[in-house]
């Protein structure tokens, strides 16, 4: 870890705990800052706040009092999930207090080079693929960021012999200033999180922050399946390395079932260890990064062939009497579910879908669900999903929760079928996050097997 003194004796407010806030508070304290933590959860239900207080860090819980900002803070580090229209953040910005996310702290202290991965879908799988390929090549890829390991925590233990492979959300990237990866990947850009950002253009602008400090010596890996990505190439100083499944590009591409990098075959598409056209895109992005880091083709091929996927991302759960169960709880938008379905024969799929109602209609999903064996529909968005099923001519049943949906899907399936949880919706109408939803699916499958 680089020892920096820019925060020494500076008053810093950490707004919101969870993993990233707790990690940021500890790091800032270690760097000599005068830290105050403010979290909305009551103290008695807040183990993180209790632990920080025991370590001598000032903690204010149970709400976000605006008068707290009457103190002269030099900096605010916010939890990425807290939107910028939060009154505390608005007041801080009005007072001229810089507002960062914990990712910026990670960059400032990291001795390791950084590879940053963002995008609407495929971030976690691509991040994991890259980490595994680099580690197999002896470059020790350390996963961090939105993948569940706080970036500032991992950066503290990383040396210059490691590589920080960092998954980055749009929420995190809104709060960076000096952040400078040597390689950045944008997997794709689709209209998501509009409720947070206000518009698609603002969402894209947040993602685009990943390359703000990059130079011609750095590499920006972009998905040339999208015209938007092509249009953005003129707006960066970085050297663009494209990938595509639709055309031959000066980077990584699919041609005649083979994955190439700049004219050289790396492996066959059907050798990738996880199904789906979206995973071909993820593998191509990984190949581009790996080749930029001088990884040999055999290591790439062996690692991606053995890749078993990521929990909650088209994760194979079990096989019960010839019925295969896949957990794709991370599919919180329509595009992710479309890509999940592309890896299967619809006539053998019982799809579990529905969740938080964000006002979306699901007409885009109609061609993708046409021909499904059955659907099991649940959640706030059930009426909208049912309308799409009716348009597609797919029979469905309704369920009260994930456990009920899983049991009903199994009843509808026969030997050779697939039960696929790919909700096309966020989980927050019923569950704290997609992980909880996916874990309940896994638990119910285990019960069905008993």
Curated annotation (Swiss-Prot):
The pathway that the record names for this protein is: Cell wall biogenesis; peptidoglycan biosynthesis
Instruction: Give the enzyme's main class according to its UniProt record, as a single word.
Output: ligase
Query: What InterPro entries does UniProt report for this protein, alphabetically?
Result: Mur-like_cat_sf, Mur_ligase_C, Mur_ligase_C_dom_sf, Mur_ligase_cen, MurD
Which superkingdom? Answer: Bacteria
Known catalysed reaction(s)? UDP-N-acetyl-alpha-D-muramoyl-L-alanine + D-glutamate + ATP = UDP-N-acetyl-alpha-D-muramoyl-L-alanyl-D-glutamate + ADP + phosphate + H(+)
Enzyme Commission number: 6.3.2.9
Picking any one GO biological process from the record gives:
peptidoglycan biosynthetic process
Q: Name one GO cellular component term.
A: cytoplasm
Q: Which GO terms describe its molecular function?
A: ATP binding; UDP-N-acetylmuramoylalanine-D-glutamate ligase activity
Annotated binding of ATP, by residue: 119-125
Q: Which UniProt keywords apply?
A: ATP-binding, Cell cycle, Cell division, Cell shape, Cell wall biogenesis/degradation, Cytoplasm, Ligase, Nucleotide-binding, Peptidoglycan synthesis
Similarity comment: family membership: Belongs to the MurCDEF family.
For this protein, the record's PANTHER family field holds:
UDP-N-ACETYLMURAMOYLALANINE--D-GLUTAMATE LIGASE
Function (record text): Cell wall formation. Catalyzes the addition of glutamate to the nucleotide precursor UDP-N-acetylmuramoyl-L-alanine (UMA).
Instruction: Please report the name of this protein according to its UniProt entry.
Output: UDP-N-acetylmuramoylalanine--D-glutamate ligase
